[in-house]
Structures are given as structure tokens and as C-alpha cells.
């Protein structure tokens, strides 16, 4: 009997599905990595007993000790339940074969859901000994492992779901009714079509098409997998769902296979160009021959590599060459990985590279959820349960697992980023320092699989982890000291080549502003993907400039006007002298080695910068409304600003977050030298607070593992947007109550809860509102306002002499521009009370200031200028004659005088 079972096991491995997708047996489970928390919840309908409780494996770098017992229990239950479906063939014989005709086989193939596993590499050696008849007979057999006896049982249960399983197929496949919210964002069942009927139907994933994905081939020679089959196999055998979804999102951001690869190649060529041109200009040109030379060959040094470049420079060249070779090797592996994602998009999601530039991310999530529904039964890997939890919220949590911790880390202000020196007392975060923080903290707290290490959840490990973190800071400081000279040279040349032409053609761009790195981390919401955040920031620039330009700077204007006059006068004198002697005067040296052309260029640049710095435009002074409108874009309003929106102090605080680009560039260059000292003297003082931070903000999510608690959007958010002053009774697995945070005050708890609720509100708007389902380069369309609301808004915001000089009113008290057109943006938040939430977050805002919030003060869009034409046309139609002409004249000419 044992020999018969061994024969069956030997023949089972030679079936067609085992050649194409690998074997499906309990042996696969022995090689499962337990770093990812997920087991598929198989619910068994057994008479007289309840369904088996699903086991929860910790998603981290440590495995569960009860993993094998749970697996054996599931397999035994499945074996007992599968016996009842044998029907007329249910003799229970282990060695019985089920004959199928070609027509039946074709019918079964149509309704078969691919169940894929991963076999051993030695199976291909035995494929030529099998016959086609044995493959057809064994194609639908499964081996079920008995956990008590360790014997292999073979059931003749076929996989033709419609034909054999019937109504009990759901119990075997584990498809139970969803118990969570029935929505696209948090749902566990296919409910997208009911919620988005107005959206054009997207193409279904190319998984269960008319013809089978598996093509029968000659038994003597196995055929290679097609691109579609390989993509399906990769999807069914994903071992790290976090990394896979991050690759899927990076592919979406990169606009497809060719764009990503070309960008990588061009980045490498940019590095090679900077190194080559800097070396050539410094070693291979004789600058002493420039005044007398007339050709490039006159100043070029022949064989400069042998004669001019020293041994140290040559050694650095060889090191750089090794680095380039390693980058090329890395690019090769990136090519293979990106090509697999390309096949996943093309064959399983039915999304081409050309569509990625315009298709919304919500549609990609939609296709992934459809793919999960169609391929519910997958390989016996640890990601089965995780795939069953795929929705928009879980996908965002997996993609931003580390970023959510960083958002909370920077918002809690527990990092010491300043030095005790006069010019560097303020906390300044630069890109260089940000990269070092990510390397030292995130690289230490998370394992290679991307999950939080469980040692951070153990309070007993606090001292050990803090000491290790301090050592990492000190080591990173030494590495930055060693690399500082090369980084300084590289970034100086990079910024020079990148911004020189921009400043040369438009010197006024020196006064442009952009958000600082710390501002971006404070403005970003939890689970807000990068393309949504960058789009929101891009829409806020114009509003931010309008707010800052409302504050006059008389002292600065006087200074810039004087410098502008002096520099312009010298340029005019030199230009006049050039007209008198155009041939020789341009090369005339005013100082040593400085010609007239040089001074005209420098003075002309100074004049252009001063001219752009002087603000001669007259605008309506209403900084309070402008800042409130800006807050709807940046989602940042500290309590210290309450009641002071119109003051210059708030404007100065905002300018620290929205600084001049030139200042930011200088800070980046200075940080290359200052970062090692911050890593040595400042950040080690925050090591204990950082370890406590990870322990206090970490919660367990079913199917997700340990994530940041603010990114989970707990039930307090989903049930009415209620704000709590304490996180009550939420226990983590390590026995720490989230409400017992003795290190943080109630104000900090309220601040964190407010940001979490705000993040939840905008997350729902991004994914639930069909208006926001646009590509990463597009802006949502605004909904048209009704004629009555437009007329009411027009009557409140447009000037009329009748309003100003009506009886019983004071003309000097009439305020123009109390409601700006930008504040009347159309509503895209139809499903949630945004104004009520903002009133809760900022209770000092009066009702008069938010009376137009219910009209739809959108955070992502405002009404274009063209949308105001119907208002003006309706005005003209309603007011003909002399009074109508006066009304039109005053509205277009006198507003703002």
C-alpha cells in the first residue's frame, strides 16, 4: 500500500499543472517564509461543529511556533470534507483514477480557477517518462496530508467547480460573506460596480478568458511558460506583498517599462557626464593659453591622463569605474524585475504603458481587486490571507508602511536637528539629513522584508535598542565625513549645470519659493500616496504666493529700488560706451582679467533680481481669507495661528516652511558639512525617544501586521469622525495600552488624533469620490453649481454702488473682496461634512468665516476663470440699460481701488 502511494505521489508530480505551475502539496508549506503575516482562512462546513478559527501568524521577522499544527488541522478538515463530494465515484479508494473525455476536459478547463504552487527543480528530469493518458487522469487529483499519521491521501476530487462542487464550493474556497465595511476602500467583497455606476467600465483582468491559460503540450517535452502564464505564476506565488505592491506603484509613477529604464540610463549618463566634464575641465585645459589662443587645440593638453592626472586621482577613477559597473549590474536586475511588473500590468490588469500617464490610480486598485476576486484560490503561500484583504486602504498601508512612521515621527517633533552654534540653532531638515535619518532609523527598525522588528515592541529591549541606534548615528557621521568632499563637488556641479540656464534666462526666478523638506512631511497625510501629495502641493503654490505678496515690505522695497537704480545706471553707461566702440570696448578690461562684458552680465543679473523683488502690484488685503484658503491645500493649521491669521508673525512662520529656493540650495550645500555633526551631537540625544515612539504608535492590523496606529483609521474615524482626547483601551499584542502614554500630553494626543481624522477624511475623498479619479497629471473637474447658488454668490461678492451707498449704511465700512472667487470652489466632498470637521479642528473659527464652506471649499481644485463667464452673462442679461452698464463698469474697473 505504501508503494502504491509512493507511485501515486511520483505520478502526481508529473502532471501538466505541476509542469506549468509547480506541485500543490504540503511540501510547499515547509518552505514558507513566516516573515509575512497571512494565512488563508479556510472555513469548513462540518456537521455538529463550528468553523475552525483562523490562526494569526505574526508578520515580522520572527516565526510562529504553532504554524505546523494549524496547517495540519486545516488539511485534516479539508480531507474529511472533500470525501463527501465524490458522488457516484466516492468509493474512497486512494488509487482510483477518474476517466475524462476530451469534451469533459475542455469543459472543466473553462471553469477551472488556477491553483498554483511551486515545485522542486528535480521534477523536470522525470517528465519524459509520463504518458498523456496518465496526465489526464492525474490532472485533477490532490494530495492531502494527514497531520496525525503523516500519510499522503489522494482524493479523486476534480477541480471543475461548476460541475462537481456545486453550492458547497464557497465553503471549500473559503469565500465567506464580508464582515467589514462594504465599500471600495475598506470592503472585502466585489462591490465596486454598485458604488461607481457613473464611471466608465474598465477592462476586466485577462485571467479567466475564453480559452485556458494552460496549453497542453507534448508529454515528452515541456513547453516554456508564456508571458501571461508567468505573470499569473508570479502573482500567485508572491511571498512579500509589501514589496510587490511597492513595485506596482513605482511602475505606475514611472509611466511604464520604457520610461523607467530610460530614466535609469539617463541618470547614469548624467553622473558620467558630470565626472567626465569636471575632470576634463580641471586637468586637460591649459587656462594660461586662453588669452592668446584662438582654437580649442591651442589650449588643450595632449595625453592629460598620463601627464596631468596623479595617482590618487587615478585610484579614484578606478573606484568610480567599479561603482559604475555595479550600477550596470543593478540595472540588469532592475530590468528583469520591472519586466515582470510590466507583464503583470499588461496581461493580468489589461493596462498598457501608454495608459499609465492618464489612468487614475483608483482604476489600478480596481483591477487588482478584480484580479483577487477571480483568482481567489492561489498557491499555498503565506500571502493568501493578505491577498484576501486587498483594498485601497490596505494597499496604501503596505506601500506607505515606512512613510507613515516617518510622517508621525516628524509631526511629533522628537528629533533634535539643531546644533548649539550661533548660526545653526534652528532645526533644519535637508535632503541629505533626511536620507541619513531614513538610513539610520528606518533601516534599523525594519527588517529586510520591510516589517517592523518585534524587538521594538518589547519594553525590556529599550536600552539595548537605544544604544545600538546611537552607534548607528555615530557611524553614519563618520561615513558622511569621508564622503563629504566628493558629495560637495558633485552637488555643486549638479546644481550649477541644472539651474544656471534657468537663472541666466530669467533671473527673477531667484526669488521663487518652494516648500522645505520638513514642511512636506508636516503637510503630508497618512496613507496619502506620493502622486496625490505632489499634485496637492503643486496646486497650493499660487495661493501661497498670493498670501505672501499681500504683506508689504516697504523697507525691502526701498533697498531693492536703490540697488536696482545703481546697477541699471552702470549697465546703461557700459552699453552706451559699447555703442561708441562696438569692436574693442566689450573686451576692454575694467579690472584685472575682468572685461566690460563680464560686468554687464553681473550687473544685469543684479538689476533683474532687484526688479522682481520689488512688489508694485496692488491687491486686496485679506490675508485671513487667503490663509484659510491656503490651509485647504496644505492641510496644516497650528493652534498657535488661531486668531492671528492676519498678522505678520504668522506670515513669517509660514515663510520658514515656504522659503526661497536659493536659501534652500545653500542649506543643502551647507548640510553636506553640518550633517556629520548633527549625527554625532544632536540625534543621539533622541535615541530613547525614537525607540519609545515605535513602541507607542504601533498597532497590529489583521492581515497587515504591525503598522502605524494613525494609518489604520480606527472605528472612531469611520463612525462619525468623532475626536477623542485619549486613545482608550486599544491594547497591542505586547500588552501596552495606547491610551497610557505617560510621555505625551493630552494636547499632543489631540493633535495626533486630529491629523488622523483629517487624513481619513481626505483619503475617503480621494478614493470614494469619482470626481477625483483622474490621472497623476490631471486635475479633477469641478461640479457645476446651480444657477441660484451662483446668483447668490455673485450678489455677495461683486461690487455695486447701491450696496455701498444704500440708506442706513456707512460707505467707508463697505468691504470689497470679503469672499474671493478662489474660496467658492465647487464641492467634491458630497459625502462628508468637511466644514463641520474643520470647525472641530479649529473651534475659534466663527460661523461667518465658514458660511461658504458648505458650497464646497475643495482642497484640490478651484473654479477656473472660464467658469465665471456664466455668472457675468447672467448679470448682463438681468441688468440692461444705464444701470447695467454702470454695474459692469464698476465691477471690472473699480474693484480694488
Swiss-Prot record:
In the UniProt annotation, the regions that are inserted into the membrane yet never cross to the other side are: 432-452, 662-682
| Alphabetical list of InterPro entries matching this protein | Autophagy-rel_prot_9
Sorted alphabetically, the Gene Ontology cellular component annotations on this record are: autophagosome; cytoplasmic vesicle membrane; endoplasmic reticulum membrane; Golgi membrane; mitochondrion; phagophore; phagophore assembly site; phagophore assembly site membrane
The answer to whether keyword Nucleus applies is no
- Show the catalytic activity: a 1,2-diacyl-sn-glycero-3-phosphocholine(in) = a 1,2-diacyl-sn-glycero-3-phosphocholine(out); a 1,2-diacyl-sn-glycero-3-phospho-L-serine(in) = a 1,2-diacyl-sn-glycero-3-phospho-L-serine(out); a 1,2-diacyl-sn-glycero-3-phosphoethanolamine(in) = a 1,2-diacyl-sn-glycero-3-phosphoethanolamine(out); a 1,2-diacyl-sn-glycero-3-phospho-(1D-myo-inositol-3-phosphate)(in) = a 1,2-diacyl-sn-glycero-3-phospho-(1D-myo-inositol-3-phosphate)(out)
Which portions of the chain have biased composition (kind: Low complexity)? 214-224
Report the transmembrane regions from the record. 257-277, 315-335, 473-493, 559-579
Biological process according to GO: cytoplasm to vacuole targeting by the Cvt pathway; mitophagy; piecemeal microautophagy of the nucleus; protein localization to phagophore assembly site; reticulophagy
Which residues does the annotated region (Disordered) include? 46-106, 112-131, 195-224
Cytoplasmic face of the membrane: 1-256, 336-431, 453-472, 580-661, 683-897
Keyword terms = Autophagy, Cytoplasmic vesicle, Endoplasmic reticulum, Golgi apparatus, Lipid transport, Membrane, Phosphoprotein, Transmembrane, Transmembrane helix, Transport
A GO molecular function annotation here is: phospholipid scramblase activity
Q: Topology versus the membrane, per the UniProt entry?
A: Multi-pass membrane protein
Task: Classify the main location.
Answer: membrane
In the record's own words, the domains note is: Forms a homotrimer with a solvated central pore, which is connected laterally to the cytosol through the cavity within each protomer. Acts as a lipid scramblase that uses its central pore to function: the central pore opens laterally to accommodate lipid headgroups, thereby enabling lipid flipping and redistribution of lipids added to the outer leaflet of ATG9-containing vesicles, thereby enabling growth into autophagosomes.
Function summary = Phospholipid scramblase involved in autophagy and cytoplasm to vacuole transport (Cvt) vesicle formation. Cycles between the preautophagosomal structure/phagophore assembly site (PAS) and the cytoplasmic vesicle pool and supplies membrane for the growing autophagosome. Lipid scramblase activity plays a key role in preautophagosomal structure/phagophore assembly by distributing the phospholipids that arrive through ATG2 from the cytoplasmic to the luminal leaflet of the bilayer, thereby driving autophagosomal membrane expansion. Required for mitophagy.
**PANTHER family assigned to the protein according to its UniProt record, in alphabetical order:** APG9 AUTOPHAGY 9, AUTOPHAGY-RELATED PROTEIN 9
- Record's subunit section: Homotrimer; forms a homotrimer with a central pore that forms a path between the two membrane leaflets.
Name of protein: Autophagy-related protein 9
**Gene from which this protein is expressed:** ATG9
Amino acid at each position: 500500500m505504501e508503494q502504491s502511494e509512493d507511485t501515486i505521489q511520483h505520478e502526481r508530480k508529473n502532471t501538466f499543472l505541476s509542469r506549468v505551475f509547480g506541485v500543490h502539496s504540503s511540501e510547499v508549506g515547509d518552505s514558507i517564509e513566516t516573515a509575512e503575516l497571512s494565512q488563508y482562512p479556510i472555513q469548513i462546513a462540518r456537521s455538529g461543529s463550528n468553523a475552525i478559527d483562523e490562526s494569526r501568524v505574526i508578520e515580522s521577522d520572527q516565526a510562529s511556533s504553532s504554524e505546523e499544527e494549524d496547517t495540519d488541522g486545516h488539511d485534516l478538515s479539508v480531507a474529511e470534507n472533500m470525501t463527501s463530494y465524490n458522488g457516484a465515484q466516492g468509493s474512497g479508494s486512494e488509487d482510483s483514477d477518474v476517466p475524462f473525455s476530451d469534451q469533459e476536459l475542455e469543459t472543466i478547463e473553462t471553469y477551472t480557477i488556477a491553483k498554483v504552487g511551486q515545485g522542486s527543480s528535480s521534477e523536470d528530469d522525470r517528465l519524459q517518462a509520463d504518458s498523456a493518458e496518465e496526465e489526464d487522469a492525474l490532472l485533477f487529483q490532490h494530495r492531502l496530508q494527514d497531520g496525525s499519521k503523516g500519510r499522503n491521501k489522494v482524493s479523486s476530487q476534480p477541480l471543475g467547480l461548476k460541475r462537481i462542487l456545486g453550492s458547497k464550493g464557497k465553503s471549500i474556497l473559503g469565500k465567506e460573506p464580508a464582515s467589514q465595511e462594504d465599500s471600495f476602500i475598506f470592503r472585502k467583497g466585489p462591490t465596486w460596480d454598485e458604488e461607481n455606476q457613473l464611471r466608465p467600465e474598465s477592462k476586466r483582468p485577462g485571467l479567466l478568458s475564453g480559452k485556458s491559460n494552460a496549453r497542453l503540450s507534448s508529454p515528452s517535452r515541456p513547453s516554456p511558460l508564456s508571458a501571461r502564464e508567468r505573470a499569473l505564476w508570479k502573482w500567485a506565488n508572491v511571498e512579500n506583498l509589501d514589496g510587490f505592491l511597492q513595485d506596482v506603484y513605482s511602475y505606475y509613477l514611472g509611466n511604464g517599462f520604457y520610461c523607467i529604464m530610460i530614466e535609469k540610463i539617463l541618470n547614469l549618463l548624467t553622473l558620467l557626464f558630470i565626472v567626465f566634464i569636471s575632470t576634463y575641465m580641471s586637468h586637460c585645459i591649459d587656462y594660461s593659453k586662453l588669452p592668446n589662443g584662438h582654437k580649442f587645440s591651442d589650449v588643450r593638453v595632449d595625453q592629460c591622463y598620463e601627464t596631468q592626472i596623479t595617482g590618487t586621482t587615478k585610484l579614484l577613477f578606478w573606484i568610480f569605474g567599479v561603482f559604475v559597473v555595479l550600477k550596470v549590474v543593478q540595472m540588469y536586475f532592475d530590468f528583469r524585475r520591472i519586466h515582470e511588473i510590466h507583464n503583470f500590468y499588461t496581461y493580468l490588469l489589461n493596462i498598457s504603458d501608454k495608459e499609465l500617464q492618464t489612468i487614475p490610480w483608483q482604476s489600478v486598485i480596481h483591477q487588482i481587486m478584480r484580479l483577487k476576486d477571480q483568482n481567489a484560490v492561489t498557491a499555498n503561500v503565506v500571502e493568501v490571507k493578505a491577498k484576501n484583504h486587498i483594498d485601497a486602504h490596505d494597499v496604501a498601508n503596505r506601500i506607505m508602511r515606512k512613510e507613515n512612521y516617518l510622517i508621525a515621527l516628524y509631526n511629533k517633533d522628537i528629533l533634535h536637528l539643531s546644533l548649539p552654534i550661533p548660526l545653526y540653532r534652528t532645526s533644519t531638515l535637508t535632503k541629505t539629513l533626511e536620507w541619513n535619518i531614513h538610513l539610520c532609523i528606518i533601516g534599523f527598525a525594519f527588517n529586510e522584508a520591510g516589517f517592523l522588528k518585534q524587538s521594538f515592541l518589547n519594553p525590556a529591549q529599550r536600552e539595548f535598542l537605544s544604544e545600538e541606534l546611537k552607534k548607528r548615528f555615530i557611524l553614519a557621521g563618520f561615513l558622511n565625513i569621508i564622503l563629504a568632499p566628493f558629495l560637495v563637488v558633485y552637488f555643486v556641479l549638479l546644481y550649477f549645470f541644472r539651474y544656471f540656464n534657468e537663472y541666466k534666462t530669467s533671473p527673477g526666478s531667484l526669488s521663487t519659493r518652494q516648500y522645505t523638506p520638513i514642511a512636506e512631511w508636516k503637510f503630508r497625510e497618512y496613507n496619502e500616496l506620493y502622486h496625490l501629495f505632489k499634485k496637492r502641493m503643486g496646486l497650493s503654490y499660487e495661493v501661497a504666493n498670493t498670501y505672501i505678496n499681500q504683506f508689504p515690505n516697504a523697507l525691502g522695497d526701498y533697498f531693492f529700488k536703490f540697488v536696482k537704480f545703481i546697477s541699471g545706471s552702470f549697465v546703461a553707461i557700459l552699453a552706451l560706451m559699447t555703442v561708441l566702440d562696438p569692436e574693442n570696448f566689450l573686451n576692454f578690461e575694467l579690472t584685472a582679467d575682468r572685461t566690460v562684458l563680464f560686468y554687464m552680465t553681473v550687473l544685469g543679473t543684479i538689476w533683474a533680481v532687484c526688479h522682481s523683488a520689488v512688489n508694485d502690484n496692488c491687491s486686496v488685503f485679506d490675508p485671513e481669507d487667503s490663509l484659510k484658503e491656503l490651509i485647504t491645500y496644505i492641510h496644516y493649521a497650528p493652534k498657535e495661528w488661531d486668531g492671528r491669521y492676519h498678522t505678520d508673525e504668522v506670515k513669517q512662520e509660514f515663510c520658514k516652511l515656504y522659503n526661497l529656493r536659493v536659501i534652500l540650495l545653500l542649506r543643502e550645500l551647507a548640510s553636506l558639512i553640518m550633517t556629520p555633526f548633527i549625527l554625532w551631537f544632536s540625534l543621539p540625544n533622541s535615541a530613547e525617544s525614537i525607540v519609545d515612539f515605535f513602541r507607542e504608535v504601533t498597532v497590529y492590523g489583521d492581515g497587515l501586521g504591525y503598522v502605524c496606529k494613525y494609518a489604520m483609521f480606527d472605528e472612531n474615524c469611520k463612525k462619525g469622525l468623532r475626536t477623542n482626547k485619549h486613545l482608550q483601551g486599544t491594547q497591542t499584542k505586547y500588552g501596552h495600552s495606547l491610551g497610557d502614554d505617560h510621555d505625551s500630553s493630552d494636547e499632543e494626543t489631540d493633535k495626533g488624533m486630529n491629523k488622523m481624522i483629517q487624513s481619513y477624511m481626505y483619503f475617503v475623498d480621494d478614493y470614494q469620490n469619482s470626481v477625483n479619479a483622474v490621472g497623476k497629471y490631471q486635475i479633477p473637474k469641478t461640479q457645476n453649481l446651480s444657477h441660484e447658488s451662483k446668483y447668490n454668490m455673485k450678489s455677495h461678492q461683486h461690487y455695486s454702488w447701491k450696496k455701498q451707498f444704500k440708506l442706513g449704511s456707512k460707505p467707508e465700512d463697505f468691504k470689497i473682496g470679503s469672499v474671493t472667487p478662489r474660496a467658492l470652489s465647487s464641492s467634491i466632498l458630497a459625502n462628508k461634512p468637511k466644514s463641520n470637521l474643520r470647525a472641530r479642528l479649529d473651534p475659534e473659527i466663527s460661523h461667518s468665516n465658514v458660511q461658504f464652506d458648505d458650497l464646497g471649499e475643495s482642497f484640490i481644485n478651484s473654479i477656473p476663470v472660464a467658469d465665471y463667464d456664466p455668472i457675468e452673462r447672467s448679470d448682463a442679461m438681468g441688468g440692461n440699460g444705464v444701470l447695467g452698464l454702470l454695474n459692469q463698469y464698476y465691477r471690472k474697473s473699480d474693484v480694488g481701488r
